[in-house]
Amino acid sequence: MGSNDPSTPSKASKPPEQEQPPATTSGTTAPVYPEWPGFQGYPAMPPHGFFPPPVAAGQAHPYMWGPQHMVPPYGTPPPPYMMYPPGTVYAHPTAPGVHPFHYPMQTNGNLEPAGAQGAAPGAAETNGKNEPGKTSGPSANGVTSNSESGSDSESEGSDANSQNDSHSKENDVNENGSAQNGVSHSSSHGTFNKPMPLVPVQSGAVIGVAGPATNLNIGMDYWGATGSSPVPAMRGKVPSGSARGEQWDERELKKQKRKLSNRESARRSRLRKQAECEELGQRAEALKSENSSLRIELDRIKKEYEELLSKNTSLKAKLGESGGGGGSDAVPDMNERGDTNGGSHQKEP
């Protein structure tokens, strides 16, 4: 697997170095990610060249915490005024590139020796290629790139060697207090740079802390309460569809009952008014019939009065005729008779 070039002495000791376990040291070491070999699986092609922009960024933002992007593209040097919190996740590139020295990058423990700290970071990887005939040192990702004519097997062998040698080199780097990019690393950066898992949240679920049991004896039995309470803890949840439906049904029932009571009261009042109207109608009819009967009686009395009046006039005429022809003796007799009969002037036949 690969050519037997004497310029790569690490390939001869490749199998034993891969089999022996990593050396354990007394100092604190950065944790090695178990999935890191899976991240280094590049396609069978030489790495792409990376050319940083020749012109630096323009004038910096006037404020320290100005508007800034969430995460810049991988390999792009950010401006000096940007600060990012630890634990930011960067997209995995297709090929290793130049890493900016303004903030620590996620590594697998492979650091440069102390002698190479004074050199410019990424100077050997500016063009993504090394000079022909020379082997490159370990990069920030622990990937070594050979010359343009180097094979993929040689790059893979240098990968394994750089990963196994990283444990012995990081102790020296921790003692000197400086890392590859000029920023001190500790074991905490390994924990900060770990990607946080995303927990899926259901749409209907409510995230919250379980509250205490809602009963009326809050604080009454604080010291004598047992570990497991018989009353289950009530959680702050949105009322489900069934509870909401029950509430809606109760409201609808109350509304229907109210409507029925209103209709019943309106019907009773309507019946009462109708009965009153019927009674008034009956009384009006009775009064009308009584009025008509009284009118009839009045007409009869008027007729009788007319008859009596005509009789009276005829009697007066007869009396005048009889008084003028009989002499004066008959008149006192009539007066006397009238006085004795109660003043009646009627003449007996």
From Swiss-Prot:
Swiss-Prot/TrEMBL GO biological process terms: regulation of DNA-templated transcription
Biased composition (Polar residues): 1-11, 174-191
Protein's cellular compartments: Nucleus
PROSITE patterns: BZIP, BZIP_BASIC
Name of the protein: Transcription factor HBP-1a
Assembly and oligomerization: Binds DNA as a dimer.
Region of interest (Leucine-zipper), residue spans: 280-315
Function summary: Binds to the hexamer motif 5'-ACGTCA-3' of histone gene promoters.
Keywords: Activator, DNA-binding, Nucleus, Transcription, Transcription regulation
Recorded family membership: Belongs to the bZIP family.
Residue ranges of the region described as Disordered: 1-39, 101-196, 224-277, 312-349
Gene Ontology terms for molecular function: DNA-binding transcription factor activity; sequence-specific DNA binding; transcription cis-regulatory region binding
Top-level taxon of origin: Eukaryota
Organism name: Triticum aestivum
